[in-house]
Amino acid sequence: FSFSMQEVMNTEDGKEWIESSSNNPLNEAKNMKKMMIDISEPIEDDLLRFTADADVIVSGLPMFMSAQAIAEKFSKRHITIQFVPFNPTKEGRATMQPPLPLSKSFMNRVSGYIGQYFTYWIFKDAANKFRKRLGMNPMSYGEYTRAYNRDVPVIYGLSKHGITEPDDWSGDKFITGYWFYDTSSDWQPSQELCDFLEAGEKPIYMGFGSMSNKNPGATTKIMIYALQASGKRGIIYSG
């Protein structure tokens, strides 16, 4: 892709999105919506180019609507992958934010549809602008949920030991187990790291993946303070 998510996360919009996610879900959604509008066009251009000769498109949540537009426009198959339970269900143990997490309830299913409306609202402006470029009508919320819950197979990179497989999901939802990168067979830790690991009890790993931060210095101080207060050793990954 001509686009790097890590680079985007280091922009002011990306940092604002990350900062707002911790204490204000509405601000988080607004910032993510703005960011998607800003970055979606080059991603969609790449999608058009990369899928020109493809029989099947595999998408994640952020580009689901754009991938579905390409699938509809050019008569291609579309599969989506997820790492959190996203399809509505009565099963609280398979609902992302269940009102009744330990029960089967219609309220959990309603919560799932509310969550899908939330994501539809975030992505619809960018995706429907793309559909307009393709000469297509906008995708409504009803069409979004029908595509997500009935028309497009979903593959979950989750374990059945982690979530309960709902009995009210359709047969095209698959929980496959967790996915892992292939490990490099020739990688060796540095001597400095080996010495540190052998010098005491197992350390705590602390890191945020590719996520950026408006004030990395203050965040690092918090992590160091937590290690000192707990009397634990740690390894901090810079990302």
What are these regions, as identified by a protein language model?
Residues F1-F3, G60, I79-V84, G157, ...:
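Generic beta-sheet signal
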Residues F1-S2, H78, P138, I204, ...:
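Hydrophobic beta-strand scaffold residues
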Residues E7-G14, P88-T95, S184-W187:
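Short, charged, surface-exposed secondary-structure boundary motifs
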Residues G14-S66, F106-R150:
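Conserved nucleotide-sugar donor-binding subdomain of glycosyltransferases
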Residues I39-N108, H161-G162:
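Conserved nucleotide-sugar donor-interacting segment of glycosyltransferase catalytic cores
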Residues F74-R77, V152, K232:
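A short helix->loop->beta-strand "cap" motif at the edges of active sites that frequently abuts
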Residues L158-G239:
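Donor-nucleotide binding loops and adjacent catalytic segments primarily
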